[in-house]
């Protein structure tokens, strides 16, 4: 197999030639024997529980099943490293090579790659300039296609023929005195026909011709020509050949990526890919045998079609025709199913890797937090900052080594919390909420240690994360290097991200829980029980009574207050009722105010009707404004 570079800039996916596929899996042993071709459908011998030679788990092709041990047991232990056993042909090496060593299957007949045939758009159909329906009829042995019309007047290149039409022309050709001259393979069927048509394409010449046609073409025809030219240009740019879309050699992925494990009852659980590969090998071997004994054409053709369907199911089960199902009528997972989708290799394992120094928990409101702070559970913090805590414990001489420090942390020694407090002081953490749709989906906060297991979040930053507190989860990441910490503090701190980068409008706005809390706090409940007129000399006295439980949050109270007063939305003040008192003092009473004035109209005292909730809200706002 070709050696891969240790350092590279990017991964490029392209078409592989049959020679390249064989190169991936082929190795030459010291005795000159070439191994790599999988020829048997067997997997593991049920008596010895060892992989069968030349089978899907062959140790000669893929490497030893046990570290430093050959198949026959002649060589064991690491001292025989690199030796190839002369008896069984297995190289003595680590078993992990079975995760990257590949094999291959030489197909007895070519088959089309289902991605290029049934993809949208179909690249094979685009390149051949044929309707997809016609290409499918040829591939699945329902129609012949003319690949060389010879001197026939009534035949054209790429014309489709039924079985009867093909036989009729064959009869005409061999009639006495017939002038019809056609080459031996003038019409073909199956993937061989598609391969022949693709081989005949001269990419450079075709591209030049298409460019000329595009200049004069209009409308739908022009769009079709441009689409075809784009595909041809891509083939030229990548140095790929069109006939490589038809497979003559099928790669077999490493056995440890399609494992077979023994269960408790002695039964085996296996990857679906092994069943799909087994179907391909069985049909391929049967086809090779039929060709060898020169079986009737109809039987050979049927076997070729079945081989095509088996390879289709292996690459992309269900893309065309009936889905191949296993036990319990469950569709088998093909190579495409393993790659694509949310649980596929790309999204699950490459884009969504597990990360060190990270945690995840449910978010709850942190009402006592500042905007740049988040509440980090102690249990999570000690795990995330463990290396920093261990370093500090050793530096202070509290413990002598890492093992003792870990033991101290596991035993929840009270000293570790003081050290942890010091470690997290000024060390920001990153909070991320999936899906991270814009820059503000991940922000930095200064952690504050809290009890419990939930991450506490300031409600003002919720709109940026599109978070609410109905069970949302967030991930915590610890920036380790000083550069990362500086970047988190300067660029990502929540207090530095007040405006939306998309619109420039403020994104730090009260929402959801804050709005609901403010509404509930200041709401006037008309159905609150009437507890009679309660009078308080000051706002503070009213709050003391509320704290002691003498009055409720929405109880109507009269409070002595000399500042301005605004009515809420929908609230109207009634006409004042005037009561004359001794000494010329007048008392004006409305449904919201009681004002006592002297003879000159100067206010002696004012009582307003409010609720403890509104007093709390007013006091909070006043305190912030005067701070």
Swiss-Prot record:
Belongs to the RNA polymerase beta' chain family. RpoC1 subfamily. It is an enzyme of class 2 (transferase). Gene3D superfamilies: 1.10.40.90, 2.40.40.20, RNA polymerase II, clamp domain, RNA polymerase Rpb1, domain 3. This is DNA-directed RNA polymerase subunit gamma. GO terms for biological process: DNA-templated transcription. PANTHER family: DNA-DIRECTED RNA POLYMERASE, DNA-DIRECTED RNA POLYMERASE SUBUNIT BETA. DNA-dependent RNA polymerase catalyzes the transcription of DNA into RNA using the four ribonucleoside triphosphates as substrates. Its cofactor is Mg(2+); Zn(2+). GO terms for molecular function: DNA binding; DNA-directed RNA polymerase activity; magnesium ion binding; zinc ion binding. It comes from Synechococcus sp. (strain JA-2-3B'a(2-13)). One of its GO terms (cellular component) is DNA-directed RNA polymerase complex. Keywords: DNA-directed RNA polymerase, Magnesium, Metal-binding, Nucleotidyltransferase, Transcription, Transferase, Zinc.
